[in-house]
Amino acid sequence: MTKSLTNMNITNKKVLLRADLNVPLENSVITDDNRIKAILPTLKYLVQQKAKVIIFSHLGRVKTEADKAHFSLQVVAEKIAFYLQQKLKFVPETQGNTLNQAVGQMLPGDVLVVQNTRFEDVPFKKESKNDPELGKYWASLGDVFVNDAFGTCHRTHASNVGIATYIKEKCFGFLVEKEISFLKKIVQTPQRPLVAVLGGSKVSDKIGVIRSLLQKVDVLLIGGGMSYTCLKAKCFNIGTSLLEADKIPLVKELLASPEGKKIVLPKDFVCGKEFSPTTQAAVYSYDNISDDVMGLDIGPQTIELFKTYLQTAQTVVWNGPVGVFEFEQFSKGTKALAETISNLSPNTTTIIGGGDSAAAVFKFGLDQNFSHISTGGGAFLEFLEGKPMPGLACMEKL
């Protein structure tokens, strides 16, 4: 059993904190800092306990030397300093004398941010392939390892599994503990009825989680791009809507299975002739979609249908928007579901998966009304699917 952070002796210790600070950037400006806010409880606790905190995180996809100019963690370090209201040190390197010296000069309560761990992916992918020498080196910088990056717990990287392999004293941060606690409520001990909502564009991304959820949920509401492949599998015309034709046999199998009766598909759609915010929108029944239009949102009948299921739920888990919420006229379905779920009884456990569904909830200003909003998109789905989670498993081993 992994120790709790509050039971660790961290005063005056060098604590390696793996955080998920992979925030979206536009022209080197952070457009959504919720992942930074999410680690503040752990970070503030470490500072209050007078630990010497050394933060590791990745940012973006770094495949070439040129990419490095766009994905420095310096802008993230500045935002952390703002929220902590204290100075911290940013080291623009991932290893070497400058980093070694900076760590050696730290005082209790100091915070240091190491450069983007994915800089080590150029050119040999040392971070992403969990290079043992890199993991061993990073581990040598600290006394204690705190993993608070749930968003990477489904990955085997040098900055999570690698460090954990070479350091004895380790634990999860408060964020990861919270993520695991809420996800176990779905997987192990849900209050029923348990209603899941799955959206997003591709059914192929979620076949595994659909199979897993059908064993656990009472109702599975499916919307978004993936619903059109489901309709096509039932031999309905979907016009020019998104289709994964190669997944039709799999979807037919799921719909025909004993658990398939738990699946509820949309009854109508808001469609347009083009994937554009200005295309003319019109509502079509699921069995009467024209050849020249594509579905871009669930329709008003479906909103009401989904509401009836959600309003009876004791546990709700939602991953993936049910429409193109970035376009105003195709955002009504996603917004209506977000409002419905956020207005459920405080006794109802409501959990939002990471990624676009979380982005939608924040966009609509409803983020305070959910029991939990996960910081991990892929990790969230893989946990629900029951896949191995290397970033969690490695914390149990000495």
From Swiss-Prot:
What's in the keyword line of the UniProt record?
A: ATP-binding, Cytoplasm, Glycolysis, Kinase, Nucleotide-binding, Transferase
The Gene Ontology terms for molecular function here are: ADP binding; ATP binding; phosphoglycerate kinase activity
Tell me, how does this one assemble?
Answer: Monomer.
User: Does ATP-binding appear among the keywords?
Assistant: yes
Output the Gene3D superfamilies linked to this UniProt entry.
Phosphoglycerate kinase, N-terminal domain (3.40.50.1260)
The pathway entry for this protein reads as: Carbohydrate degradation; glycolysis; pyruvate from D-glyceraldehyde 3-phosphate: step 2/5
Compartmental location: Cytoplasm
Any keyword Protein biosynthesis? no
- State the Gene Ontology BP annotations: gluconeogenesis; glycolytic process
Annotated residues that bind ATP are located at 206, 295, 326, 354-357
Recorded catalytic reaction(s): these are: (2R)-3-phosphoglycerate + ATP = (2R)-3-phospho-glyceroyl phosphate + ADP
Family the UniProt entry places it in: Belongs to the phosphoglycerate kinase family.
List of residues binding substrate: 20-22, 35, 58-61, 118, 155
State its Enzyme Commission number(s). Answer: 2.7.2.3
Q: What is this protein called?
A: Phosphoglycerate kinase
Q: Which domain of life is it from?
A: Bacteria
**HAMAP family in the record:** Phosphoglyc_kinase
Q: What are its GO cellular component terms?
A: cytosol
InterPro entries in alphabetical order: Phosphoglycerate_kinase, Phosphoglycerate_kinase_CS, Phosphoglycerate_kinase_N, Phosphoglycerate_kinase_sf
Q: Which Pfam families match?
A: PGK
